[in-house]
């Protein structure tokens, strides 16, 4: 049977997840997406296992489906066979090995609820499995694999998102350099690895040590709507053994559906707090130290792959599987309409498309563009055509900030940006006081255009900040321009009256707003007099076309700012 499998997800019992992470909604969204096999996620959590036992019934060997009386009425509106569930869960192992603290995530698949119960009981003697659907255990990955094999020889352990900097097998901060260093004598029992959102198959093909492993992809979804953002293409016997052969031996594993790796939040190097994104070579030139604040740069997936790879490209790998880069359909609709992907209009159009044309994956991958155009018009169909042919613009993610993918140029649609942001705000885990970073320094800054910049909507101004900033920068001499655009930790401007110091300062602020995407609330400008502060505010208001952003900045004398704080 040909189908799509997403095996690594999380229920509502994991931290930072949707309340809709229930069997009912997983079933609903798997139908919408066109997914045949869904991992249950979080099998170690007692309450989740209890819920699974109550709401699932056995289907094919090792697979389950939702009980008929648990199926949401809405689910019946979508065609296709009921999706199957397979027992899955993720374990976070934090332990010391070879003189270094290791933090590794592993996904486990099991053939049934009884095996999940036995393994969970054993893990409960080692650590707390009640507080989080993805338990954190002080358990060596080698020992976790050994315990699993003793309790359930047919279990499958897959190192999860193997390149993620902080919690993975090859992570730059707390991982290993080789599979053998992690799993030792049990390495032969590892047959597959999960590439993760920030890497794709070609990046992994560059590391010959991975040639003997199957490369699989999953969504790691924290809400049902995120199912399938990465997934596996299968042609297998519909059973756990069929799935086992695909993952362990590659028999029936026909390829993967991938995120654009640039969109992953750890693709490039950088420092989110300083709004700094760097290529691996640029990060090395800075010695791994942020030139703005002097702290360590977060090493991204692309850099870590470069460190361990032994090939210039992956063409030498013999058993390569096909892969497809996709983005969710609501984001294509949003990009073509100029609306937010979460807007009512986009959601209504999304639902209508599913009911008229078929599942989301069929629309994105199979249905002829002409048929889509006939039903939905030019822009949506053109967006899908470009997606299928790889005609996208990419702005890479870094240090925990997701990258962005663009399908349209500004002049192609009514919306002035045509850019997509693929994650709802609640799903972006931001530290207090740290704003989303959307620019990237890469031999010159890559500009991201946004519909709303720093609280100032497009309609509120006649000219964009980008145009004003460009115009202002062009009026500076070389030394003034250097001061305005530097990424150095500090810059001193020594000049007499009438030499353009205020103009340079204004240019610096505009540069931070537009090129570095710094929030106005993070900008402080100190003046010697109240009159100078007033003049600075007035000139900024003139440049920005509104007071809103200026009022969010901290502009004043030293004493007035101290009083405000």
Can you say where each PLM-predicted feature lies in the sequence?
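Divalent metal-dependent hydrolysis catalytic cores, especially in the metallo-beta-lactamase
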Residues: 29-48, 156-158
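C-terminal functional module detector
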Residues: 1-2, 28, 46, 57, ...
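Active-site mouth loops of central-metabolism enzymes
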Residues: 9-22
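Extended substrate/RNA-proximal surfaces in nucleic-acid metabolism proteins
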Residues: 2, 21, 49-191
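P-loop NTPase Walker
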Residues: 463-565
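Active-site environment of divalent metal-dependent phosphoester hydrolases
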Residues: 12-14, 40-49, 94, 115, ...
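Histidine/acidic-residue-rich catalytic or RNA/ligand-binding cores of hydrolases
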Residues: 17, 49-53, 167-174, 205, ...
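Conserved, mostly hydrophobic/aromatic
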Residues: 8, 42, 108, 157, ...
